[in-house]
């Protein structure tokens, strides 16, 4: 006779691989075989429950001995989840993910029977009351994620039995009082996330017993004074986040005992003086985030002891002089962000010792001359941001030695001549952004040697002729942005060799005829944006071969007839935008095959009758926009079946608020974002 472990293993194999239902029935009802394998009726009940579980949640688990169950984004009550989980008896379950957007009541957690559960995620829900945690049996819990809920009160943490807890995430709630933390028994805690709350008094952390704490986030609260940090006993702290507060003085950093600190994030505060960094003992610091402050003087960096620094962000400050960079000892520097300052002179870069630099951001400054780039020793540079500066030519790019460059951003500069790119040696380049430059001629693209290019941004220029695209060698291209130009003829798309193209944007041009789309070879296309043109006829959509299309933007055209949608083969469609047209009849929606659609924009048309909405099969629909039409009768919303609807726009129609008051009240309660009003745009 086989032992129980082997018999259950055999049962697992059978349920995973045997597709013949007759064999399953024979196995189930053959008592002799049952006895031989020592399989009990409870085992079968578990497997029956597993089938129901899979069906209910539209998933496919084949084994009850799994360690992780992911039910993210599933619209289902928690008590039903717990019921099935207990029925199936997932004895090995260690990780349960329930980030669904729908859960508000978690009282059923008291019934949970998973002794090995280590991770419970309930983030991005509507939970406000967590007192049930006092009664749950999760002694092995190590990670509890409750971020982005409506929690304001956390006193229950004093009573929970989570002695093995290592990570507690309360980010993005409404918590103001954290005094209970001095009473909790979380001696193993390594990560505490408290950002995006309403905390002003964080000094209580002076009394907590978190000797193993490695990560502390207090960003986006209402903290102005950080002097309490010197009393914190967090000797193992590696990451400290204090961003988006009202901090002005950081002198306390000279007295804190965070010798192992690797990341300090104090961006978006009101800091102007950073001279105290000279006396800070963060020898292990790797990342320093100081952007969006009021810093003008950075000479202190010559004296700091941050020899391991890899990332420094100084963007959006008041810095003019960066000459100190030639004196700093940041040999491991990989990312330097200096965008949105008042920098005019970057010649100092020639003398810097940033041999490992991978990312350099100089955008949105008053820089007129970038010729020094020819002399810098940035052989490992991968990303270069030069947008919105005042250079009148890019000739130096023919001479730079950035052979590993992957991303180059040159939008909004003072030249429309990009011919120098023909001689640039950027063989690894994958992203090129040259939009908003008044470019008219793109013939230079034929001669560039960017064979690995995946993303090309040519939007917001003055391009009329795109025929050169038939001659370019961009076989890896996945994203092409041509919006907001003067393009009227797109016939060249038939001849281009962009077999991997996934995103094509052509909105904001002058195209009226899109029949060429029937002949293009974009089998991997996921997003097509041709809104804001002069299109009236979309019958070609019946013939296109865009079987993977997920997003279609037809907005702001002259379309009145959408009946062709009945015949299109867009089974993956998730987002359809046809607003700002002349559509009055939407009865075709009953016949379309958009089972996966999540967003439908029909706003600002001439629609009166929406009764077809009760007949459509849009079970995944989350956003429906009907505002700015001529709708007066909204009673159809008593019958529609959109279980996941979160956003409904009905404002700027002819709906009478008084006669529909009850229905409006119901929809306002049921739908997260519901807008309505009486008048139409034409009134």
At which residue positions do the language-model features occur?
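N-terminal Skp1-binding subsegment of the F-box domain
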Residues: 1-29
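Leucine-rich solenoid repeat scaffolds
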Residues: 18, 632-683
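LRR N-terminal entry segment and analogous cap-like coil->beta motifs
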Residues: 20-24, 31-118
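Conserved hydrophobic beta-strand positions in leucine-rich repeat
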Residues: 67-71, 96-98, 118-122, 141-146, ...
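Conserved "Asn-ladder"/turn position within leucine-rich repeats
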Residues: 74-76, 101, 125, 149, ...
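A structural signal for leucine-rich repeat
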Residues: 85-89, 107-114, 131-138, 155-162, ...
């Amino acid at each position: 006779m086989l032992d129980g472990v082997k018999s259950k293993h055999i049962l697992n194999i059978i349920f995973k691989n045997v597709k013949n239902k007759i064999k399953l029935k024979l196995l189930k009802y053959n008592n002799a075989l049952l006895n031989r394998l020592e399989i009990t009726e409870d085992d079968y009940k578990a497997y029956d429950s597993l089938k129901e579980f899979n069906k209910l949640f539209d998933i496919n688990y084949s084994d009850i001995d799994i360690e992780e169950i992911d039910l993210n984004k599933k619209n289902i009550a928690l008590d039903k989840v717990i019921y099935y989980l207990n029925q199936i008896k997932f004895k090995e379950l260690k990780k349960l993910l329930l980030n669904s957007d729908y859960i508000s009541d978690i009282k059923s957690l008291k019934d949970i029977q998973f002794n090995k559960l280590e991770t419970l995620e309930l983030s991005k829900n509507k939970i406000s009351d967590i007192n049930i945690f006092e009664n749950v049996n999760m002694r092995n819990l190590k990670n509890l994620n409750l971020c982005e809920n409506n929690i304001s009160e956390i006193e229950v943490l004093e009573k929970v039995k989570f002695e093995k807890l290592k990570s507690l995430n309360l980010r993005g709630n409404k918590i103001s009082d954290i005094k209970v933390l001095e009473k909790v028994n979380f001696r193993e805690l390594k990560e505490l996330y408290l950002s995006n709350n309403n905390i002003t008094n964080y000094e209580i952390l002076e009394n907590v017993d978190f000797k193993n704490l490695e990560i502390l986030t207090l960003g986006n609260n209402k903290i102005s004074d950080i002097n309490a940090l010197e009393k914190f006993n967090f000797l193992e702290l590696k990451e400290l986040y204090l961003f988006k507060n009202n901090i002005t003085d950081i002198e306390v950093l000279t007295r804190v005992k965070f010798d192992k600190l690797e990341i300090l994030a104090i961006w978006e505060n009101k800091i102007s003086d950073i001279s105290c960094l000279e006396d800070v003992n963060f020898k292990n610091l790797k990342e320093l985030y100081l952007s969006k402050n009021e810093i003008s003087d950075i000479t202190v960096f010559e004296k700091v002891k941050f020899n391991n620094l890899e990332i420094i962000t100084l963007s959006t400050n008041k810095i003019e002089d960066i000459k100190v960079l030639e004196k700093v000892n940041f040999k491991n520097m990989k990312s330097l962000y200096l965008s949105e300052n008042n920098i005019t002179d970057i010649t100092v870069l020639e003398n810097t010792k940033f041999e490992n630099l991978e990312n350099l951001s100089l955008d949105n400054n008053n820089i007129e001359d970038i010729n020094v780039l020819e002399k810098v020793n940035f052989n490992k540079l991968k990303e270069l941001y030069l947008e919105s500066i005042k250079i009148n030519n890019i000739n130096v790019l023919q001479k730079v030695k950035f052979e590993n460059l992957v991303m180059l951003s040159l939008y909004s500069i003072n030249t429309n001549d990009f011919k120098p790119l023909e001689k640039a040696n950027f063989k690894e380049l994958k992203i090129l952004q040259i939009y908003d430059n008044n470019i008219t001629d793109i013939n230079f693209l034929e001669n560039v040697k960017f064979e690995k290019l995946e993303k090309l941004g040519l939007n917001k220029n003055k391009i009329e002729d795109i025929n050169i695209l038939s001659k370019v060698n961009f076989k890896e291209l996945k994203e092409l942005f041509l919006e907001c130009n003067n393009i009227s003829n797109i016939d060249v798309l038939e001849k281009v060799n962009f077999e991997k193209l996934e995103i094509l944007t052509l909105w904001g041009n002058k195209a009226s005829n899109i029949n060429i789309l029937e002949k293009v070879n974009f089998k991997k296309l996921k997003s097509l944006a041709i809104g804001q043109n002069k299109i009236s006829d979309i019958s070609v959509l019946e013939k296109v071969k865009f079987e993977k299309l997920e997003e279609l933007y037809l907005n702001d055209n002259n379309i009145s007839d959408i009946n062709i949608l009945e015949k299109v083969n867009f089974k993956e469609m998730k987002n359809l935008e046809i607003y700002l047209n002349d559509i009055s009849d939407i009865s075709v929606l009953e016949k379309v095959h958009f089972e996966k659609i999540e967003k439908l924009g029909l706003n600002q048309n001439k629609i009166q009758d929406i009764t077809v909405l009760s007949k459509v099969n849009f079970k995944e629909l989350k956003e429906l926009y009907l505002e700015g039409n001529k709708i007066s009768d909204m009673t159809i919303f008593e019958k529609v079946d959109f279980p996941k609807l979160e956003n409904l726009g009905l404002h700027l129609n002819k709906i009478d608020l008084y006669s529909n008051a009850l229905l409006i009240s119901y929809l306002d309660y049921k739908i997260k974002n519901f807008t309505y009003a009486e008048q139409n745009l034409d009134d």
